[in-house]
Amino acid sequence: MIAATPAKSKPSDVNLEQTFKGVSETSKIDLRRSRAAYRPLELSPTPSIFARNYQRNAVDFTGFFVLFWVAVSIMIFMSFLENFELTGRPVVGTIFKYFQSNLLDLAKADLAMSSMFLLAFPFQKIFALGYLRWYGLGVYLYSILILLFLSHCVLRCCLSNWSWTHRAMFILHSMVILMKLHSYNVVNGWYSYCYHSLNKLQSKKTDLDDDERSSVEFYEHCLNHHGNTYPENLTIPNALDFLFMPSLCYQLYYPRTAHVRIHYLIECALGTFGCIFLLVIISDHFMVPVLAKAIRTIIEAPEDASATYFAIRLGHTVAFLMFPFMLSFLLVFWVIFEGVCNFSAEITRFADRNFYDDWWNCWTWDQFARTWNKPVHYFLLRHVYVPLNSFMSKSLSTFFTFFVSSVLHELVMGCITLKIRGYGLFFQMTQIPYIIIQRQKFVRRHRLLGNIAFWFSIIIGIALIAALYILF
């Protein structure tokens, strides 16, 4: 039996009118919305943010900085977890044992070495009061004292029963104090000469001629900078201020910030210790095993092994060390210039935080020397290059400036490894012919190729020099 289906009633004219009216209103609303949604975008020829030879204002890369620290935290946590599963302790490793040994002895030695800087204050008071002249006996006496300080630092570092990590920290800090001592004494010695020369001219009873008046103006300009004058600057607080300041060049005036930001000090301290911890993890996991295997291979090498055999072993070791050493180099760079220097600058309210420029874009080695470590660059320029250039040509002054820098680098490596091999001296001096080649027109026209060559030399060079000092 089939049930009958009731017939549908036809809509009335009133319902049809209301229905079409609603559809019409909806169509009008959609039209207005679509006009706003599909109107043309305001497009213009704009390169990518990461495109070369283009700078976009107000581009914020803070997210990459946050990503880096998140990755660091994850890596540290994973290291803790792995160590705890294997040994039951979160922190293990050879490098951690090095850090824990002889810490008190290192602290005492470093404090004594740093305190020697304060002896420069009474030493310069002698010249300010006129008991001795700087350009005379003063320069010779200072040269003897600075050599004694350097000898003390080297002997204290090499003869102590310290690990290589302690030797590295001590000798690097010694080099910083050495440069600060030199700048403080040389600049204040020059001020003492200007001060006594000015007093001599002003005490003349006769009228000054034009040259003497020009000399008076010159000396007054040198001895007064933004209201800070010599010899009023020769005080213990001023010497301590320069000791803790992230500058290697002494002067009467430095720009200052309004106040010290405690939260920023905490941020710098946490970042520094986090990077140091990450450096330890990289060393223990990716450097020590490779170097231990290489040392074992060299010791167990057959007696008739040729130079080719050792060259292959060296190349194999360098290949496995390139990435961890490159990463360590970047972390050390951050620790020094973003962590330690900014912490020191914040404490002393030192306002000029331009400790480096965009050295990662360098396409010549002289660019790198000027931009990656600006405090040392300013020191070498002011206290080495300019004095040499007063009686030498520009090329000879540049050569000897590189030579002084290379000798200091070799001294640092010798104190850390307890070996004098000359690898650092040789490779740093080879930068001079590289610079000559990089200044040719072809390289200047193809800066990308220069930057690629720069990064290859950095990546290979750091691992190669480290492997040479450790293995041979």
UniProtKB/Swiss-Prot annotation:
Keywords: Acyltransferase, Endoplasmic reticulum, Glycoprotein, Membrane, Phosphoprotein, Transferase, Transmembrane, Transmembrane helix. The active site is at H409. Glycans are attached at N161, N233, N342. The modification Phosphoserine is found at S12. It is an enzyme of class 2 (transferase). Pfam families: MBOAT (PF03062). The chain crosses the membrane at residues 61-81, 111-131, 135-155, 170-190, 262-282, 317-337, 452-472. A motif (FYXDWWN motif) lies at residues 355-361. InterPro entries: MBOAT_fam (IPR004299), Oat_ACAT_DAG_ARE (IPR014371). GO terms for molecular function: ergosterol O-acyltransferase activity. Sterol O-acyltransferase that catalyzes the formation of stery esters. This is Probable sterol O-acyltransferase 2. It comes from Schizosaccharomyces pombe (strain 972 / ATCC 24843). The gene is are2.
